Amino acid sequence: MKFAVIVFPGSNCDRDMYHAVKEVAGAEAELVWYTETDKLEGVDGILLPGGFSYGDYLRSGSMASTSDVMHKIREHAAKGKPVLGVCNGFQILTESGLLPGALMRNKHLSFMCHQEELVVEDNQTFFTSLYEKKEVVRFPIAHGEGSYFCDEATLKELQANNQIVFTYKNNPNGSIENIAGIRNKQGNVLGMMPHPERAVEELLGSDDGLKLFKSMIANWRDSYAINA
Protein backbone atom coordinates (compact mmCIF):
# COMPACT_ATOMS: atom_id res chain seq x y z
CA MET A 1 0.00 0.00 0.00
CA LYS A 2 1.33 3.42 -0.95
CA PHE A 3 0.55 6.45 1.20
CA ALA A 4 0.94 10.14 0.43
CA VAL A 5 1.56 12.34 3.47
CA ILE A 6 0.40 15.82 2.46
CA VAL A 7 2.63 18.66 3.68
CA PHE A 8 1.17 22.17 3.92
CA PRO A 9 3.02 25.32 5.00
CA GLY A 10 2.87 24.99 8.78
CA SER A 11 2.45 21.21 8.97
CA ASN A 12 4.63 19.79 11.74
CA CYS A 13 3.50 16.19 12.21
CA ASP A 14 4.22 15.04 8.66
CA ARG A 15 7.47 13.27 9.54
CA ASP A 16 5.83 11.56 12.51
CA MET A 17 3.15 10.26 10.14
CA TYR A 18 5.74 9.20 7.57
CA HIS A 19 7.75 7.37 10.24
CA ALA A 20 4.65 5.59 11.54
CA VAL A 21 3.43 4.22 8.21
CA LYS A 22 6.75 3.56 6.48
CA GLU A 23 9.32 2.74 9.13
CA VAL A 24 7.04 1.12 11.72
CA ALA A 25 4.00 -0.23 9.83
CA GLY A 26 6.09 -1.15 6.79
CA ALA A 27 4.04 0.49 4.04
CA GLU A 28 5.29 2.57 1.14
CA ALA A 29 5.03 6.31 1.83
CA GLU A 30 6.04 9.65 0.37
CA LEU A 31 5.99 13.19 1.72
CA VAL A 32 4.07 15.26 -0.83
CA TRP A 33 4.24 19.07 -0.83
CA TYR A 34 0.74 20.47 -1.24
CA THR A 35 1.44 21.88 -4.73
CA GLU A 36 2.72 18.55 -6.09
CA THR A 37 -0.74 17.28 -6.96
CA ASP A 38 0.57 15.10 -9.80
CA LYS A 39 2.23 12.87 -7.21
CA LEU A 40 -1.18 11.71 -5.97
CA GLU A 41 -1.68 9.62 -9.11
CA GLY A 42 -1.35 5.97 -8.17
CA VAL A 43 -1.53 6.62 -4.43
CA ASP A 44 -3.66 4.22 -2.39
CA GLY A 45 -4.13 6.22 0.82
CA ILE A 46 -3.87 9.90 1.71
CA LEU A 47 -2.78 11.13 5.13
CA LEU A 48 -3.38 14.70 6.32
CA PRO A 49 -1.10 15.27 9.32
CA GLY A 50 -1.31 17.66 12.23
CA GLY A 51 0.27 21.06 12.65
CA PHE A 52 -0.79 24.61 11.96
CA SER A 53 -1.40 24.83 8.22
CA TYR A 54 -1.06 28.43 7.06
CA GLY A 55 -0.56 29.44 10.68
CA ASP A 56 -4.22 28.67 11.47
CA TYR A 57 -5.18 32.04 9.96
CA LEU A 58 -8.93 32.64 9.62
CA ARG A 59 -9.71 29.26 11.25
CA SER A 60 -7.75 26.08 11.78
CA GLY A 61 -7.66 24.22 8.47
CA SER A 62 -9.66 26.88 6.63
CA MET A 63 -7.02 28.05 4.16
CA ALA A 64 -5.67 24.56 3.50
CA SER A 65 -9.19 23.36 2.72
CA THR A 66 -9.36 25.65 -0.33
CA SER A 67 -6.02 24.58 -1.84
CA ASP A 68 -5.86 22.74 -5.17
CA VAL A 69 -4.65 19.54 -3.53
CA MET A 70 -8.00 19.22 -1.76
CA HIS A 71 -9.75 18.90 -5.12
CA LYS A 72 -7.55 15.87 -5.81
CA ILE A 73 -8.25 14.51 -2.34
CA ARG A 74 -12.02 14.85 -2.90
CA GLU A 75 -11.63 12.89 -6.14
CA HIS A 76 -9.58 10.27 -4.29
CA ALA A 77 -12.25 9.95 -1.59
CA ALA A 78 -15.06 9.80 -4.16
CA LYS A 79 -13.42 6.67 -5.58
CA GLY A 80 -13.73 5.03 -2.18
CA LYS A 81 -10.03 5.26 -1.39
CA PRO A 82 -8.99 5.94 2.22
CA VAL A 83 -8.24 9.37 3.65
CA LEU A 84 -7.07 9.90 7.23
CA GLY A 85 -6.91 13.35 8.80
CA VAL A 86 -5.31 13.77 12.22
CA CYS A 87 -5.59 16.92 14.36
CA ASN A 88 -5.13 19.75 11.85
CA GLY A 89 -5.91 17.14 9.20
CA PHE A 90 -9.30 16.55 10.87
CA GLN A 91 -9.89 20.31 10.89
CA ILE A 92 -9.09 20.44 7.17
CA LEU A 93 -11.53 17.61 6.46
CA THR A 94 -14.39 19.39 8.23
CA GLU A 95 -13.55 22.75 6.62
CA SER A 96 -13.51 21.12 3.18
CA GLY A 97 -16.84 19.38 3.73
CA LEU A 98 -15.45 15.85 3.54
CA LEU A 99 -16.63 15.36 7.12
CA PRO A 100 -19.52 17.08 8.94
CA GLY A 101 -19.25 19.39 11.92
CA ALA A 102 -16.48 21.69 13.08
CA LEU A 103 -13.60 21.88 15.57
CA MET A 104 -13.83 24.71 18.09
CA ARG A 105 -11.67 26.13 20.87
CA ASN A 106 -11.11 23.79 23.80
CA LYS A 107 -13.54 24.37 26.64
CA HIS A 108 -10.78 25.78 28.88
CA LEU A 109 -9.45 27.95 26.03
CA SER A 110 -5.95 26.51 26.41
CA PHE A 111 -3.65 24.31 24.36
CA MET A 112 -3.64 20.72 25.62
CA CYS A 113 -0.76 18.26 25.19
CA HIS A 114 -0.91 14.92 27.01
CA GLN A 115 -1.99 11.29 26.72
CA GLU A 116 -5.71 10.55 26.60
CA GLU A 117 -7.68 7.33 26.85
CA LEU A 118 -10.08 6.70 23.96
CA VAL A 119 -12.81 4.14 23.42
CA VAL A 120 -13.06 2.35 20.06
CA GLU A 121 -16.78 2.73 19.37
CA ASP A 122 -16.77 1.01 15.99
CA ASN A 123 -14.29 -1.67 14.95
CA GLN A 124 -16.08 -2.46 11.70
CA THR A 125 -14.26 0.22 9.72
CA PHE A 126 -11.36 0.35 7.29
CA PHE A 127 -9.31 2.00 10.03
CA THR A 128 -10.21 0.03 13.16
CA SER A 129 -10.76 -3.61 12.19
CA LEU A 130 -7.81 -4.86 14.26
CA TYR A 131 -9.21 -3.33 17.46
CA GLU A 132 -11.86 -4.81 19.72
CA LYS A 133 -15.16 -2.96 20.03
CA LYS A 134 -15.07 -0.79 23.16
CA GLU A 135 -11.30 -1.34 23.46
CA VAL A 136 -9.63 1.41 25.48
CA VAL A 137 -6.51 2.85 23.83
CA ARG A 138 -4.06 5.63 24.71
CA PHE A 139 -3.15 8.29 22.15
CA PRO A 140 -1.51 11.69 22.68
CA ILE A 141 -3.49 14.86 22.04
CA ALA A 142 -1.95 18.23 21.16
CA HIS A 143 -4.43 20.92 20.19
CA GLY A 144 -6.02 24.21 21.11
CA GLU A 145 -9.05 23.88 18.83
CA GLY A 146 -10.13 20.27 19.21
CA SER A 147 -13.64 20.51 20.62
CA TYR A 148 -15.86 18.75 18.10
CA PHE A 149 -19.24 20.37 17.49
CA CYS A 150 -22.19 19.71 15.22
CA ASP A 151 -25.88 20.54 15.28
CA GLU A 152 -28.45 18.14 16.73
CA ALA A 153 -29.58 16.81 13.35
CA THR A 154 -26.01 16.02 12.32
CA LEU A 155 -25.32 14.34 15.67
CA LYS A 156 -28.37 12.10 15.28
CA GLU A 157 -27.21 11.19 11.78
CA LEU A 158 -23.70 10.36 13.01
CA GLN A 159 -25.16 8.14 15.71
CA ALA A 160 -27.68 6.45 13.41
CA ASN A 161 -25.00 5.66 10.81
CA ASN A 162 -22.38 4.50 13.33
CA GLN A 163 -20.06 7.25 12.13
CA ILE A 164 -18.60 7.95 15.58
CA VAL A 165 -15.41 5.87 15.60
CA PHE A 166 -13.56 7.10 18.71
CA THR A 167 -14.73 8.81 21.89
CA TYR A 168 -12.80 10.21 24.86
CA LYS A 169 -13.11 8.42 28.19
CA ASN A 170 -12.50 11.70 30.03
CA ASN A 171 -13.56 14.44 27.65
CA PRO A 172 -10.63 16.90 27.81
CA ASN A 173 -11.82 19.59 25.41
CA GLY A 174 -15.62 19.78 25.58
CA SER A 175 -16.38 17.78 22.44
CA ILE A 176 -20.06 17.02 21.99
CA GLU A 177 -20.85 13.44 23.12
CA ASN A 178 -17.12 12.96 23.90
CA ILE A 179 -16.39 12.62 20.18
CA ALA A 180 -12.71 12.15 19.30
CA GLY A 181 -13.02 10.82 15.75
CA ILE A 182 -15.66 10.34 13.06
CA ARG A 183 -15.91 8.81 9.60
CA ASN A 184 -17.93 9.70 6.53
CA LYS A 185 -21.01 7.69 5.52
CA GLN A 186 -19.07 5.70 2.95
CA GLY A 187 -16.54 4.74 5.61
CA ASN A 188 -13.34 5.63 3.76
CA VAL A 189 -12.64 9.04 5.36
CA LEU A 190 -11.67 9.27 9.03
CA GLY A 191 -10.90 12.40 10.99
CA MET A 192 -9.65 12.40 14.57
CA MET A 193 -8.00 14.87 16.94
CA PRO A 194 -5.76 12.43 18.89
CA HIS A 195 -2.48 11.35 17.27
CA PRO A 196 -2.21 7.63 16.42
CA GLU A 197 1.09 8.28 14.62
CA ARG A 198 2.63 9.31 17.93
CA ALA A 199 1.51 6.04 19.53
CA VAL A 200 3.21 3.39 17.40
CA GLU A 201 6.12 2.47 19.69
CA GLU A 202 6.16 1.60 23.39
CA LEU A 203 9.23 3.83 23.71
CA LEU A 204 6.87 6.79 23.23
CA GLY A 205 4.43 5.58 25.88
CA SER A 206 1.97 3.59 23.76
CA ASP A 207 1.84 1.54 20.59
CA ASP A 208 -1.97 1.52 20.44
CA GLY A 209 -1.96 3.60 17.26
CA LEU A 210 -0.10 0.98 15.26
CA LYS A 211 -3.22 -1.14 14.84
CA LEU A 212 -4.93 1.75 13.07
CA PHE A 213 -2.30 1.85 10.33
CA LYS A 214 -2.10 -1.94 10.17
CA SER A 215 -5.89 -2.07 9.82
CA MET A 216 -5.65 0.23 6.80
CA ILE A 217 -2.91 -1.86 5.21
CA ALA A 218 -4.69 -5.18 5.85
CA ASN A 219 -8.03 -3.94 4.52
CA TRP A 220 -6.40 -2.46 1.43
CA ARG A 221 -4.78 -5.82 0.71
CA ASP A 222 -8.13 -7.54 1.15
CA SER A 223 -10.06 -5.17 -1.09
CA TYR A 224 -8.22 -2.71 -3.33
CA ALA A 225 -5.32 -5.02 -4.17
CA ILE A 226 -7.67 -7.86 -5.11
CA ASN A 227 -9.82 -5.58 -7.27
CA ALA A 228 -6.88 -3.83 -8.94
Swiss-Prot record:
One of its GO terms (biological process) is 'de novo' IMP biosynthetic process. PROSITE patterns: GATASE_TYPE_1 (PS51273). Residues 3-226 form the Glutamine amidotransferase type-1 domain. SMART domains: GATase_5. The keyword RNA-binding does not apply. InterPro entries: Class_I_gatase-like (IPR029062), PRibForGlyAmidine_synth_PurQ (IPR010075). The active site is at 87 (nucleophile), 195, 197. Its EC number is 6.3.5.3, 3.5.1.2. Pathway: Purine metabolism; IMP biosynthesis via de novo pathway; 5-amino-1-(5-phospho-D-ribosyl)imidazole from N(2)-formyl-N(1)-(5-phospho-D-ribosyl)glycinamide: step 1/2. CDD domains: GATase1_FGAR_AT (cd01740). GO terms for molecular function: ATP binding; glutaminase activity; phosphoribosylformylglycinamidine synthase activity. It catalyses: N(2)-formyl-N(1)-(5-phospho-beta-D-ribosyl)glycinamide + L-glutamine + ATP + H2O = 2-formamido-N(1)-(5-O-phospho-beta-D-ribosyl)acetamidine + L-glutamate + ADP + phosphate + H(+); L-glutamine + H2O = L-glutamate + NH4(+). It is found in: Cytoplasm. Part of the FGAM synthase complex composed of 1 PurL, 1 PurQ and 2 PurS subunits. Part of the phosphoribosylformylglycinamidine synthase complex involved in the purines biosynthetic pathway. Catalyzes the ATP-dependent conversion of formylglycinamide ribonucleotide (FGAR) and glutamine to yield formylglycinamidine ribonucleotide (FGAM) and glutamate. The FGAM synthase complex is composed of three subunits. PurQ produces an ammonia molecule by converting glutamine to glutamate. PurL transfers the ammonia molecule to FGAR to form FGAM in an ATP-dependent manner. This is Phosphoribosylformylglycinamidine synthase subunit PurQ. The gene is purQ.
